[in-house]
């Protein structure tokens, strides 16, 4: 984010964002911070030690570390120590609220957001949560209930995990993405049968492991007519890069294999088909850029959130779901071959993905924040 003036120079008042320290939480927080600062708000981010590594993406001096801990209910002997850290974070937030006098507190999930949201309720400050996934995370469920968040901003429709009463507070905004993603969007053009076909494959650490093992085997099953024009870019674990590249070369395919792509939005825009997991940011970015994708949700994930994310896009016609446990190289190769030569289906799916995307999500979320900031004193809306 471009650096700006200090908080004393801002005239709109202060908004506090609270986020866990992972990209899935921090990307939308960063996008909202950009939108709010453009509207003359002073934005402060409260996060944990991991989130402090993102300081260079926010305005100088606007990121503050608070005490926090994940609650591991499966190991109850650790809970007292973990709870004490959350209580310490709660007290830290109350002290900082007295100094900052925020108009609104916005939680983006992750346990570091919990003490911030609880402190907002105690201090009588308006609050809202933004849920990135189609299934509410634990921290946001706590924030919406015990934290008494007045607004629940959702990225997907339908949204699962909240009570019927809490659902009355839901507002569909979409999941804010980085400006780099918005700038990468351009019309999709399916390639002719004799033109190069760009396949992009990526996932998180577990996705990278599975795709590194599976995708070269799938490609080896493809007809020569498909292999001849196929170009692959794939995210791999560092220890897998050489082996994956060699497997593709043995199949006659040119492959760019890296552990990290710093130009991922541009790679997505250049792709004709994407094979990926279905994390919230991934689905949001593919929608904004408008590219057809085969989604392979992370199996056995908590609450099946990735499956629900992918189902939202599939219902909109913007992609296809394949379940990892059911996939075989032969069956997947048959699906891929059909799509490779079906320009109409690829184009139709790309358009549907784009229609499902929300490039204005950050602005819609900023609108919700400002509506709260302009309202009166918070009312108790927690479940009875």
Which role does the model predict for each range below?
Residues 2, 358-384:
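C-terminal alpha-helical cap of glycosyltransferases
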Residues 12-20, 37-88, 173, 238-240, ...:
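Conserved nucleotide-sugar phosphate-binding/catalytic loop shared by glycosyltransferases and other
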Residues 62, 92-105, 113-128, 141-146:
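Glycosyltransferases and closely related glycan-assembly transferases
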Residues 33, 37-38, 44-46, 50-60, ...:
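Donor-nucleotide binding loops and adjacent catalytic segments primarily
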Residues 42, 50, 121-186:
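Active-site-proximal region of nucleotide-activated glycan assembly enzymes
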Residues 17-30, 209:
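A short, glycine/small-residue-rich beta-strand->loop->alpha-helix junction that serves as a flexible
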């Amino acid at each position: 984010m471009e650096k700006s003036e200090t908080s004393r120079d801002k005239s709109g008042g202060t908004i506090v964002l609270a986020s866990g320290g992972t990209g899935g939480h921090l990307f939308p927080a960063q996008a909202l911070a950009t939108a709010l600062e453009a509207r003359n708000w002073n934005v402060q981010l409260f996060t944990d030690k991991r989130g402090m590594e993102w300081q260079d993406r926010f305005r100088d001096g606007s990121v503050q570390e608070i005490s926090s801990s994940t609650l591991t209910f499966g190991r109850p002997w650790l809970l007292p120590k973990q709870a004490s850290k959350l209580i310490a974070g709660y007290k830290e937030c109350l002290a900082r609220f007295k100094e900052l006098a925020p108009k609104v507190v916005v939680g983006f999930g992750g346990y570091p957001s919990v003490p911030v949201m609880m402190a907002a309720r105690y201090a009588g400050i308006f609050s809202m949560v933004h849920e990135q996934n189609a299934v509410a995370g634990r921290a946001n469920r706590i924030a919406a209930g015990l934290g008494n968040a007045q607004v629940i901003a959702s990225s997907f429709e339908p949204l699962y995990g909240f009570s019927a009463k809490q659902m009355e507070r839901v507002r569909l905004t979409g999941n804010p993405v980085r400006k780099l993603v918005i700038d990468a969007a351009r019309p999709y053009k399916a390639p002719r049968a004799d033109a190069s076909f760009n396949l992009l494959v990526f996932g998180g650490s577990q996705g990278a492991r599975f795709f590194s093992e599976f995708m070269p085997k799938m490609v080896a099953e493809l007809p020569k007519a498909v292999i001849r024009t196929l170009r692959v870019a794939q995210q791999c674990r560092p220890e897998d890069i050489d082996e994956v590249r060699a497997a593709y070369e043995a199949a006659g395919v040119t492959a760019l294999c890296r552990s990290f792509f710093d130009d991922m939005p541009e790679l997505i825009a250049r792709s004709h088909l994407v094979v990926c997991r279905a994390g919230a940011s991934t689905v949001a970015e593919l929608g904004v850029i408008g590219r057809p994708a085969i989604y392979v949700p992370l199996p056995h994930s908590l609450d099946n959130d990735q499956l629900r994310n992918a189902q939202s896009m599939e219902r909109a016609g913007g992609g296809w779901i394949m379940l990892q446990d059911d996939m075989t190289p032969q069956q997947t190769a048959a699906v891929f071959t059909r799509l490779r030569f079906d320009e109409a289906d690829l184009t139709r799916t790309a358009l549907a993905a784009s229609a499902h995307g929300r490039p204005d999500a950050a602005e819609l979320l900023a609108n919700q924040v400002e509506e709260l900031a302009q309202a009166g004193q918070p009312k108790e809306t927690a479940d009875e």
